Amino acid sequence: MRVKKGFKARRRRNRVLKLAKGFRGRRKNCYRRANQAVERALNYSTRDRRLKRREFRALWIVRINAAARQNGTTYSKLVAALRKAGVEIDRKILADLALALPGDFAAIVKTAQA
């Protein structure tokens, strides 16, 4: 009896086409093009999850440095002073404070410098 592997192949193709939903042109409905596009997209998403962490950390550092300079110090001096004072606030929280609550950020800078 001949076995045509219909169910398995159809399920595999449908899975790929479902992942390709939202793509433009033949990449959304032609299996071969969709498969290539989905594979590339998954590779990029893996790479960019790591890049996202780096980019956010750099953004936080830029924001903290700008706020620190408004308070008469620099980023590196502020971080060293915070560590020496035993203040354990991460860069994400510091950047949010610098942006949303500049007064509280200034108080933290004074605490670190004291």
Curated annotation (Swiss-Prot):
Task: Report the GO molecular function annotations.
Answer: rRNA binding; structural constituent of ribosome
For whether the record's keyword set contains RNA-binding, the answer is: yes
Q: Name one GO biological process term.
A: translation
Q: Which InterPro entries match?
A: Ribosomal_bL20 (IPR005813), Ribosomal_protein_bL20_C (IPR035566)
Q: Supply the alphabetized keyword list.
A: Ribonucleoprotein, Ribosomal protein, RNA-binding, rRNA-binding
Question: Per the record, a Pfam family?
Answer: Ribosomal_L20
Gene3D superfamilies xrefs? 6.10.160.10, Ribosomal protein L20
The UniProt entry's GO CC annotations, sorted and at most eight, read: ribonucleoprotein complex; ribosome
Function, as annotated: Binds directly to 23S ribosomal RNA and is necessary for the in vitro assembly process of the 50S ribosomal subunit. It is not involved in the protein synthesizing functions of that subunit.
Similarity comment:
Belongs to the bacterial ribosomal protein bL20 family.
Name the UniProt record assigns to this protein: Large ribosomal subunit protein bL20
Q: Which organism is it from?
A: Anaeromyxobacter dehalogenans (strain 2CP-C)
